[in-house]
Amino acid sequence: MPIKIDKKLPAVDILSSENIFVMDDDRADHQDIRPLNILVLNLMPQKMVTETQILRHLANTPLQLTIDFLYMSSHQSKTTRAEHMETFYKTFDEVKNRYFDGLIITGAPVEHLPFEAVDYWEEFQRVIEWSKTHVFSTLHICWGAQAGLYARYGVDKHQMTRKLSGVYSQLADSSNLLFRGFDDEFYAPHSRHTEVLKEDIVNLTNLEILSYGEDMGLSVLASRDLREVYSFGHMEYDRDTLSKEYFRDLKAGKNPHIPENYFKNDDVHTTPALCWSSAAALFFSNWVNYAVYQETPFDWESPENDVSFFAYL
């Protein structure tokens, strides 16, 4: 089913070339259904790349979605044109009086900093607090997951001895709706310098560990009501994203190790196999369907007609 986005967004041409169904406002407004409203807080430096990655998976869901992009006004992007941000993104002040069915918070390359040292940390905390009463389910990704846990529960991240980079096998709790239809094991890319330890969250009875791997530790956590989902990997990554990160770091003189389980025979000149796309599509689809669509109020403007939402607050 289609996603409803601005037809001028650069991702539209890419998605259309992949036979992914996108529609503009005029066509969507003539359909007599309520689309789900999804807000994406894009903290990644390459905004347009991340937009396409996220939208590609959201478009695989069987529901019509209206997507808005959010940026932190307390931070100035150095890698994306101001014109793009002004055209396609909203500030928190512009959305804070609205309700959203879902919120996606991406990763960010700020792991080396304490959370409080991130220049948009105070604004990020306001978004998290606002989401408790204005968003039905929030999907946190990588640093977004670590930051969400810290903002909500005070759980800190830990520095790893070396960067975790590669495609890793992890176990899935297929009894949970987020992993319905999954095999016992699935693969996903991970790319991070820090981690959240299992022992730091086992006493948080509101959270469940849904996916774990021997080589990369925690992969996915969620609250029991699925209003909070924390994914420490990057299921949204393209085939070549880890490759681009590797060569970027190599050029910068960081002496990176070759991403694990990625290049055939660790030959960096080969094309990496794409072995996580179907699992990623199913994960995003399950989140939209089971965590958002099946539970969110139909009429946000008249919440008294649907008290199920407020039972969670």
UniProtKB/Swiss-Prot annotation:
Keywords: Acyltransferase, Amino-acid biosynthesis, Cytoplasm, Methionine biosynthesis, Transferase. GO terms for molecular function: homoserine O-acetyltransferase activity; homoserine O-succinyltransferase activity. CDD domains: GATase1_HTS. The keyword ATP-binding does not apply. It is found in: Cytoplasm. It catalyses: L-homoserine + acetyl-CoA = O-acetyl-L-homoserine + CoA. Pathway: Amino-acid biosynthesis; L-methionine biosynthesis via de novo pathway; O-acetyl-L-homoserine from L-homoserine: step 1/1. Coiled coil: none annotated. Transmembrane segments: none annotated. The record marks 191 as: Important for substrate specificity. Substrate binds at residues 163, 191, 248. GO terms for cellular component: cytoplasm. InterPro entries: Class_I_gatase-like, HST_MetA, MetA_family. One of its GO terms (biological process) is L-methionine biosynthetic process from homoserine via O-succinyl-L-homoserine and cystathionine. Disulfide bonds: none annotated. Pfam families: HTS. The active site is at 142 (acyl-thioester intermediate), 234 (proton acceptor), 236. Transfers an acetyl group from acetyl-CoA to L-homoserine, forming acetyl-L-homoserine. This is Homoserine O-acetyltransferase.
